Amino acid sequence: MLHRPLFPGTRPEETAHAPASRDLDIGRESIWISYRPISMEAFQPSLRIQFSHHRLATPVSPWERLKIGCGTPPILTRHGWLIVYHGVSEIETLNENPGKDPPTDGHQLCYSAGVMVLSKEHPQVIRYRSTKPVLTPTLPEECHGTVAHVVFPTGIDRRDDLGLPNRLDVYYGMADSRIGVARLDVPDTLPPGSVADSPEAKA
């Protein structure tokens, strides 16, 4: 199971502060992977019961420097398990729509989306990770709403029904007010220059 333990101080309604260092620590909001034996499902169906926990990824790139978290369910591709996850940074903004957008002090959290590919056999190993976001708030519907400057990936659909197994439709929240859909095409080879937290994750 992929999940993110929730730590105080980084909810959208709270003030954002950039971390003082790039040290990897438990307090950073990161993506974790947890396991449990399949044999447990017969008598304990709750996914809250896990026995093996590993930190999969922490914030690395500028667009995700405050925190990262899961997004779409993992979907199997030719390269491994693909997930579209969200990352959060802080941007300077002006309140362009008084009365419509929540008031700000000139700083705003910005939610963008990136791609991560995990090994098919060993999903705790990151094979590829976006150096830049694949989706970032640019449309008016993404920049203005209940929570401004948010794209939040949630659903994903492989279009086998159209005979296009390498086409993925990603459904995402737009400023917490609307639902959008974006197209993602799986390439023949993974792009170079992926980033990871550790040498082991680059395998």
Regions found by a protein language model. Name each.
Residues 70-73, 152-155:
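Beta-propeller and closely related beta-sheet repeat lectin domains
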Residues 1-66, 75-147, 160-168, 172-203:
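Beta-rich carbohydrate-recognition and catalytic domains
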